[in-house]
Amino acid sequence: MSKRGSLQDRASPSEETVKKAQKRRKPIKSCAFCRKRKLRCDQQKPMCSTCKTRGRSGCLYTEKFTHKIETKELFGSTPNIELLKRIEDLEKRLDDKELTEKDVALSTSPFRNPYANFYYLQCKGSGRRIVYGPTSLRTHLSNDDNRFVNTYNQLWSKVKIERNRWKARHKWTMKPETQLLEGPPLEKTGSDILQQVCNVLPSFEQSSKIITDFFNTELETNEVSEVLDKTKIINDFTSSFLPSDELLPNGERRIEKLLPSTKKNYYKIGVILMILCIRHFYKNTPEEIEKFLIMLTGLSTAKVYFIERAQFLLLKYYHRELIWACGDDSHMISLVDLLCSTAIMLGLHLNIREIYKNQENIVGSMESLENLWVWIILSDFNVSLNIGRCLAINSSYFQVDECENGERLPKNTNNYSSTVFFDQSNSCMGKLKRFLRLARPMLDQIYDRSAFPDLAENCKKLRNFVETEFHPISYYTDSELISKVPLCEIKVLAQVLNLLLTFYSLRYLIYKEKSVVLENNILQTILVSFSLVINTTILCFNLDEKHFPEFFDHNCVHLPPFMALSLVYTNFLFPRASTGFCAFLYHKLTLFEKGYYLSSNIKDQEVTDWDLSTLNIPLDKAMNLLTAFKIHSDIFAKWSNDNNKQLRIIMARSYTFVINIALESIYRAVLEKVIKYRTEVENTWLQQLQDELNGSYSLTDNVNTPIDPSLSDLGVTSASPLAGNSPGLPPEEVRNNSENASHNNETGPIETELAQTISNEFWTAYNLGWEELMSQPDYKYLFDTQ
């Protein structure tokens, strides 16, 4: 059989054969797809049955083409090059048409990505506007139950009064840069900015000791030093920070002059100043230094692309995390954008060991550069997740995303630094690299309009990652065992939990998914997160007492190093967990439609048996909401009990800790009011109805039935009606949710009427109680840190 592209002359060499009458060729009626693949075609139009069964978008028949090809031309003695090119061109057009139709079908599909357009525009009265995307906590809160959002906003508006008093008392600001514009000018000394910086620096000997201690790897508070080369930094210090010849009374020398290296590389000075800010000045950076750092950050010519610029920007980002951690990274957006663009221009996304080969004396060790790239990827991931925007360093610069099934890039594909992330070591850095390799594609999918992210599968992968990469969860939720875990492991685990809660929330809010598994997992992950945050704070407090006792002097205003580090690790997790917990319980506790009643008693055994040693919850595990609230209260009691009074005093030095305490107090007040008024109204009406019925209609079973996400109860309460309102939900998923809600979906008329009566009474009592709370003159009890 002759192949396409090598047609042969089939004419017989004999004269008799040529003279024979040739058979008339039948017109081609099969579609192009069937003819090309030699399949049987029933020639139906517009689409044959073969193409239908194969899921094609349409058939193409040859009569659509008017180009006439003579028999002689088709069956010549030599291949027709022009004809072959024409065939190849038509086949390419066919393939392109198929791809275009597939893309159009995908873009108009009711199952397209539902997350990409999920956002919230924050509008301030001052005119400031910020768009928060699908993974932002602000977006989730703004799209939650209106009753809860209104309740939260009312109480928070009152607490803001006390917050502003605290800020005035402690002279706290989140805007140190703009403060320089508003404050009085620096004294005119006739000196340049570098000389002004010299005047506020510690002595040469003290600065040298601070820098040396910064590279002490025995203390985990120095973790960020791994992005720098110690030998290079010390050399930069001695060559750029010149001491005076005169001795101070204590025998030390002041720094007399700052000397930039060749080509005006001021970033070497900037890196060393940031080390001093992190380990010496803390939140009280002198205005002279702040002004110089702002200038370095704002330089925007091509003359600034030194490795030290990327290191400087990363250290500035880290310093902000230590001092001005605000939960959603909104103050990090511009800084991280600069950091990421600088990294790309420096080629850190390429094979670092290849492009910077034999340049160690200028840029530092290869290991420090690779660590710098990992930290930049992490900072980009944090801002993207917490703000809700696309990654600044997209997959084109992060080729790990191109690997399928976790397979390592081939050895000949060695142009990118992606191989850095295939670290199989059991170190904290190895765990962090593997997490970023797993999580970045998940985050990318959220913004890919042509994708349909499988968040349930992503959650499963994240839970498996926790099981395979970390100590058992009990090591993090037990206040004694957590001391056996490296602090940097807590950093990575908190990242996993934060992403896990984000995906759970998206499933709950957008798809209104109310399955037993999801709601159990939400509660369990939140409680594990609470326990992790509280235990980490107390652990770091104890480490500070041991290593930094000078910070416990009552005249000290700075947060001790380990406690500051605990904020870096958990400040983004706490707001998401606490807000999610309160919103979830508020919604469940104010559901009355199906006639379920809140149990007024919590058995001590239920609290004792609650298993916080795993993230995987059995399907048949009934999770009582009141028990969950009791466990939540017990966890946070570690912050407020008398044994930890000193802890609260130290926490009061940090704006972030103070806000966290206030948030927890707000949420607890809201939930306590809901539980109180619902329990009172239920008990009154159920007792009254029981007396009237004289036992003719028994509600005994239902009286003690708590609202909880059990297999029989939770599906009935909310899954069915809400799932029906989700046009973007795939049919199979809708069907599964409906099946969960189908059984036990019957209530008697008396119970239905009673549920409505209890609902009306509850909201009346709740609204009156809420007015009393809002009319109180003093809200210090919600903002108390002592």
Curated annotation (Swiss-Prot):
Residues 737-747 have a biased composition (Polar residues). Keywords: Activator, Cytoplasm, DNA-binding, Metal-binding, Nucleus, Transcription, Transcription regulation, Zinc. It comes from the Eukaryota. Residues 1-25, 721-747 are annotated as: Disordered. Disulfide bonds: none annotated. GO terms for biological process: regulation of transcription by RNA polymerase II. SMART domains: GAL4. It is found in: Cytoplasm; Nucleus. The keyword Isomerase does not apply. Signal peptide: none annotated. Residues 31-59 bind DNA. One of its GO terms (molecular function) is DNA-binding transcription factor activity, RNA polymerase II-specific. InterPro entries: Yeast_MDR_Regulatory (IPR052693), Zn2-C6_fun-type_DNA-bd_sf (IPR036864), Zn2Cys6_DnaBD (IPR001138). Its main location: cytoplasm. GO terms for cellular component: cytoplasm; nucleus. Present with 125 molecules/cell in log phase SD medium. Transcription factor involved in the regulation of multidrug resistance genes. Acts in concert with YRR1. This is Zinc finger transcription factor YRM1. The gene is YRM1.
